[in-house]
């Protein structure tokens, strides 16, 4: 079981209202698109959620196509491109260190983030959307006890 926040749905399981899909400009061809579309939709006043009681079997863990460490590295890069609030990203990386492969997965996330900074990768979101995302992430950090050890319901 993989944890996702209640307002995020993994890419292959997404459905959209027609008006929302039009407003967000469709599915953008960027890494982390399934997070980008959620942020833009919610910034525009749409509600987003997942349905954890609907069971779906993925054939592999998210981000593991090229191996878990490459997935962690890419996750760090996507996080930078999406404009993650740095303290939130650091907390997320530390949280990743608590899962296999222990410690090194979080280190690879940080390396991916740093590589994206140094290579000046372009942002996937506009400044207004990044501000919206960071406000959400600051709220999560302030209420971290609700999320720290949470897993989705079975």
Enumerate the language-model features and the residues they cover:
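Short, charged helix-to-loop "capping" segments that act as catalytic/coupling loops
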Residues: 26-29, 100
């Amino acid at each position: 079981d993989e944890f996702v926040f209640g307002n995020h749905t993994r890419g292959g399981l997404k459905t959209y209202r027609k008006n929302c899909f039009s407003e967000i400009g469709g599915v953008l061809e960027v890494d982390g698109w399934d997070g980008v579309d959620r942020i833009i939709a919610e910034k525009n006043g749409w509600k987003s959620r997942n349905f954890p009681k609907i069971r779906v079997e993925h054939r592999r863990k998210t981000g593991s196509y090229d191996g878990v460490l490459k997935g962690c590295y890419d996750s760090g890069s996507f996080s930078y491109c999406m404009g993650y609030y740095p303290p939130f990203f650091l907390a997320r990386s530390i949280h990743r260190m608590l899962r296999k492969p222990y410690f090194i997965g979080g280190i690879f996330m940080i390396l991916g983030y740093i590589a994206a900074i140094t290579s000046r990768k372009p942002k996937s979101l506009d400044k207004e959307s990044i501000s919206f995302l960071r406000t959400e992430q600051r709220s999560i950090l302030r209420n971290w006890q609700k999320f720290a050890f949470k897993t989705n319901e079975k």
